[in-house]
Amino acid sequence: MIHAGNAITVQMLADGIAEFRFDLQGESVNKFNRATIEDFQAAIAAVKANNDIKGLIVTSGKSTFIVGADITEFGENFAQGEKAIVDWAMPVHDIFNSFEDLELPKVAAIN
């Protein structure tokens, strides 16, 4: 196992191909909440550190792939104004960019 988190696991399948699996434990759906975002960042770092990975297959352990952001977490940030929203959103944006910037092919397997 390359990374074993509560929302994401990364494991080598074969021939340099790893599975990057979203499966938020304790929830019926995958969503981008704070815990998932932190796990996402750690999983990306684990992939970057593993030179044996030549490609990623992104999968989901749920019947829906990912439903999106956890809007229940928006309220406290929105109540604090524009600066709080930017301060909260930009690091998340950077994490998604770091996934995009991984220098290996990525394929999403959505059924």
Please give the residue ranges for each predicted region.
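Generic beta-strand/beta-sheet core signal
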Residues: 59-60, 109
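Glycine-rich beta-to-alpha active-site loop
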Residues: 93-111
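Conserved CoA-thioester-binding segment of acyl-CoA-metabolizing enzymes
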Residues: 1-59, 83, 94-97
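Glycine- (often His-adjacent) and acidic-residue-rich active-site loop
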Residues: 60-95
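Structural preference for beta-strand elements that scaffold enzyme active sites
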Residues: 17-19, 66, 107
